[in-house]
Amino acid sequence: HSLGADQLYGNLGVVAGQYLKSIVKRGDIIGCVPGRGVAGLVDNMPQLERTGLTVTQLMGSESRREYNLEVDSILHRFARKLSALPQPLYAPVLVSNAELRESIVREPYYQEAYAVMKRCTVAVVGIGTATTYEQYITGANRQPGTAAAGAAAPVGGVHSFQNSFTHR
């Protein structure tokens, strides 16, 4: 019999939490891309007691209702589970023009958050989906009218990192 998506994300979260517990060490900066998989990890991982941890976002937030995954909530719950300091990134993942992007990236708060992102030692990201049919459908084709039309400039994201993440 097949598992429902919630149960599958929960099971993945338990295993990912065990793995994360085995690799995270004192002082790590853990970057995450909050989504359903990371939410499953946060909801199902054990409490972790390490000192000096920071949790930060690796990309901005999507504000459209159909993609809203409560990024702030996931990030802060993740930080609590790790006894870590949260470092949110209050910026959209896409903006409509390059001038707006430049304005955002010049903001001192953004520069501070981005500096933390660049020092990440562990990255927690979801890859694909937990259900078979969804992995073959691109985001623009999931819901009519939800393509990122007019999106001209990404504000911050994993693709802009100069560091390379390696397996420990």
Residue ranges and their predicted role:
Residues S61-R168:
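Conserved phosphate- and dinucleotide-binding cores of soluble alpha/beta proteins
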